[in-house]
């Protein structure tokens, strides 16, 4: 077949010349030599005599845990020292009868004594109002004390001011507990009744089945709406189609449902 082709086409089918030989760049496989693998018995002497000058490097996780423990220890020591010196009975800023004093918390930081007086003077005459401020910056700490002249005015104000809005914030009212409750500690010393309750873990609710056993349903998607064997529906809503057929001579007078294929 090839001999019938013309010469120009036969030149296209001619074999190509062989590739030029180049010496290999790598070592031949038969001449390769790899390091010999030996056991670890000769290294046991180094494990028996530990280097006393070696100090292990502290990882980032170990450093984080160490700093956390040190910070917690300092916090506990600071609380112990503050509890020792805390004495509300001999505080020069605490003035007035403790049973006539109301405690206000969650105040707006721009609330002044005049705002509190305008809001609580309706319940009775006020002897003294003190908004606790920072000793260094002079800014409000968000809580205050109101001393009434009569104890009954305190009780009326305590009941009427629950959930009161003052300067756009809903405040919390309570009686003074520092001098009336034995062993009471404020929140800054680890006690108190305050705090943001939404940060606490809520109790988990038990999740049961979607369908209860006392609901009268069979469960699943049918819901238990099936016909009973007594000739009527299960819920007693009248006779079934078979009873209509027996009353009218075998002919069903109930409306037919159109079926769509």
Curated annotation (Swiss-Prot):
SMART domains: RRM (SM00360)
GO molecular function: mRNA binding; U1 snRNA binding
UniProt keyword terms in alphabetical order: mRNA processing, mRNA splicing, Nucleus, Ribonucleoprotein, RNA-binding, Spliceosome
InterPro entries in UniProt: Nucleotide-bd_a/b_plait_sf, RBD_domain_sf, RRM_dom, snRNP70_RRM, U1_U11-U12_snRNP_70-35kDa, U1snRNP70_N
Transcription is among the record's keywords: no
BP terms from Gene Ontology: mRNA 5'-splice site recognition; mRNA splicing, via spliceosome
Cellular component GO terms held in the UniProt record: commitment complex; cytosol; nucleus; U1 snRNP; U2-type prespliceosome
Compositional bias annotation for Basic and acidic residues: 198-215
Cell location: Nucleus
The RRM domain, residue ranges: 100-178
Main location: nucleus
Region annotation Disordered: where it falls in the sequence: 192-261
Function comment: Involved in nuclear mRNA splicing. Essential for growth.
Summary of subunit composition and partner proteins: Component of the spliceosome, where it is associated with snRNP U1. Associates with U1 snRNA.
Full protein name: U1 small nuclear ribonucleoprotein 70 kDa homolog
């Amino acid at each position: 077949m090839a001999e019938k082709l013309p010469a120009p086409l036969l030149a296209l089918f001619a074999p190509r010349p062989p590739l030029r030989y180049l010496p290999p760049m790598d070592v031949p496989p038969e001449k390769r030599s790899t390091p010999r693998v030996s056991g670890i018995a000769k290294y046991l002497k180094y494990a028996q005599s530990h280097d006393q000058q070696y100090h292990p490097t502290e990882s980032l996780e170990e450093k984080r845990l160490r700093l956390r423990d040190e910070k917690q220890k300092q916090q506990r020591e600071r609380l112990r020292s503050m509890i020792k010196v805390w004495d509300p009975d001999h505080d020069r800023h605490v003035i007035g009868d403790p049973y006539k004093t109301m405690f206000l918390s969650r105040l707006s930081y721009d609330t002044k004594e005049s705002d509190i007086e305008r809001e609580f003077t309706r319940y009775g005459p006020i002897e003294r109002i003190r908004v606790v401020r920072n000793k260094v910056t002079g800014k409000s700490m968000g809580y205050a004390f109101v001393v009434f002249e009569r104890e009954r005015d305190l009780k009326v104000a305590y009941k009427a001011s629950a959930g009161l809005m003052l300067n756009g914030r809903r405040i919390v009212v309570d009686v003074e507990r520092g001098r009336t409750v034995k062993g009471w500690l404020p929140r800054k010393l680890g006690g108190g009744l305050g705090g943001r309750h939404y940060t606490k873990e809520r109790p988990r609710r038990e999740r049961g089945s979607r369908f209860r056993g006392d609901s009268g349903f069979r469960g699943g998607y049918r819901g238990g709406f099936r016909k009973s064997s007594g000739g009527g529906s299960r819920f007693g809503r009248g006779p079934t189609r078979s009873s209509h057929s027996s009353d009218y001579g075998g002919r069903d007078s109930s409306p037919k449902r159109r079926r769509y294929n």
